[in-house]
From Swiss-Prot:
Pfam families hit by this protein: TehB
Presence of the UniProt keyword Cell membrane in the record: yes
Subcellular location: Cell membrane
Role, per record: Induces agglutination of neuraminidase-treated erythrocytes.
UniProt name for this protein: Hemagglutinin 1
Organism for this UniProt entry: Eikenella corrodens
GO biological process: response to tellurium ion
This protein's record includes keyword Transmembrane helix: yes
GO molecular function: S-adenosylmethionine-dependent methyltransferase activity
Any one annotated GO CC term: plasma membrane
Amino acid sequence: MVSALSCTHERRCYAIRTHLLQNYAGMGLSHYSGSSFVAAQHTGWYLRQAARIARAAEVFELQEDGTVLAEHILQPDSGVWTLYPQAQHKVEPLDDDFAVQLEFHCEKADYFHKKHGMTTTHSAIREAVQTVAPCKTLDLGCGQGHNALFLSLAGYDVRAVDHSPAAVASVLDMAAREQLPLRADAYDINAAALNEDYDFIFATVVFIFLQAGRVPEIIADMQAHTRPGGYNLIVSAMDTADYPCHMPFSFTFKEDELRQYYADWELLKYEEAVGLMHATDAQGRPIQLKFVTMLAKKPG
């Protein structure tokens, strides 16, 4: 599930397909025939060696210096053999009629980053899915759609909205390429005029682009269109006395401001802490700001 696999083999040919496991998604297949090959260390994804093998092959688990740690004989009826990240291995045919197929897998949250080079799934989304089960979900301000696409891949019923028609078109194109049932459309968040109810509404690093005077109405609209027992997740930059924001954002939260908007909700997480943006400064360093991260559950 990466756009450019770091494994090195003598022969390789990738046929991309989606193959889902419970917690992992498959990115590509590699087919080998005729001679031995060595797979160097790979990181961040799982490699499953399918038993689509003509005749037999011997698999060696290796140390970095080539020392053999274990040997396995694979035949067409051997089932699936799994090699985990940070492992080296070598496959050698035991006769001339040899073919093997490899499948590469990674965590679903890394799928679109590794396969398509998109921004990685936001850490707050990764954490939220440990609490919020698959449900009807709204991504407010989806941008390129990396969070919405991950959630759709993970089984959530996702609608993604953004003010940019180009961003929406890009998300829909990616969803179609990956055969995901994700909805996306253009929407002005400042209008605070949602027309559907959801179990989970989130806005990650979006409020900084919104009209400051519309924020109370936007949050009230989010809350009104969250079903009882549903969740809101907001991550946004802050401007506080101890950590002033020098970026030209249209809006930043003050200390404890977001908490007050959700005084009647159950705050499952509320954190005001220094963090890094994906954007960089003139020296190429990630911009450091104070952020508020909140996951709140609506009563009911």
